[in-house]
Amino acid sequence: MIPSTYPNNSTMAAMTARMLLDIRAVHFNTDEPFTHASGLQAPTYIDCRKLISHPRIRSTAMDFLTCKVMRDAGLEAFDNIAGGETAGIPFAAFVAERMALPMSYVRKKPKGYGKTAQIEGEMPEGARVLLVEDLTTDGGSKLKFVDAIRNAGATCAHTAVVFSYGNLPETEANLAAHGLTLHSLTTWADVIAEARRGSDFNEATLTEVERFLSDPGGWRGDRGLNTD
């Protein structure tokens, strides 16, 4: 793979946003907000895992993600590609294949039998590992996976995702404080811009979603929703 043969990063961001919209991975509902794993409600939901069921779009998105990592971090920056259990595993496999590198995966916690391993696959001591996931919000789950990688004797200074929320400045700051650089293909801003160009959602919905993204706590508070 030669990164210079691919579109620039902003074009790849827009194209990835369009692909996510086309496979109906993006959901907005301002009347009945979605409840996320954190327990907080939001009018936005994205399911990047749908990519694995759409081969042509999946292939393009994984080409783009691999290209972005190689542009940002370098062609020879890694020795191993690791996926986080479970959503990150297929994406790590796709990236590892494109970079011709070994792949492993990281469990959320050590298994309670056998060798009680938390890292599956071979990850040599000192290996430079790229952690691949489907998306990131506040980056919290990434840090747990990175800690497991580092505790296994490898190094991990980079994580790559298809989608980053992009409206939480503390995310990259939190990751950077732990020595981790985030590489993401596309964000909510890219998705909304593409949705507006393609008329995927009405303008009232997009405007309300933008209000939420600019002030999530205020948006929830105005509706009497949990803000903690």
Curated annotation (Swiss-Prot):
Q: Which residues bind 5-phospho-alpha-D-ribose 1-diphosphate?
A: 107-108, 111, 133-141
Record-listed E.C. numbers? 2.4.2.10
Q: Which organism is it from?
A: Jannaschia sp. (strain CCS1)
Annotated binding of orotate, by residue: 137
What are its GO biological-process terms?
A: 'de novo' UMP biosynthetic process; pyrimidine nucleobase biosynthetic process
Tell me the keywords, alphabetical order: Glycosyltransferase, Magnesium, Pyrimidine biosynthesis, Transferase
> What does the function comment of this entry state?
Catalyzes the transfer of a ribosyl phosphate group from 5-phosphoribose 1-diphosphate to orotate, leading to the formation of orotidine monophosphate (OMP).
The entry's protein name is Orotate phosphoribosyltransferase
Reaction equations catalysed: orotidine 5'-phosphate + diphosphate = orotate + 5-phospho-alpha-D-ribose 1-diphosphate
RNA-binding found in the keyword field:
no
NCBIfam families noted in UniProt:
PRK00455.1-3 (NF001729), pyrE (TIGR00336)
Which pathway does it operate in? Pyrimidine metabolism; UMP biosynthesis via de novo pathway; UMP from orotate: step 1/2
Protein family membership = Belongs to the purine/pyrimidine phosphoribosyltransferase family. PyrE subfamily.
Q: Which cofactor does it need?
A: Mg(2+)
Q: Describe, as the record does, how this protein assembles with itself and its partners.
A: Homodimer.
GO molecular function annotation: magnesium ion binding; orotate phosphoribosyltransferase activity
Which InterPro entries does the annotation name?
A: OPRT (IPR023031), Or_phspho_trans_dom (IPR004467), PRibTrfase_dom (IPR000836), PRTase-like (IPR029057)
* Parts forming coiled coils: none
Say yes or no: keyword Membrane present. Answer: no
Query: What Pfam families does this protein map onto?
Result: Pribosyltran
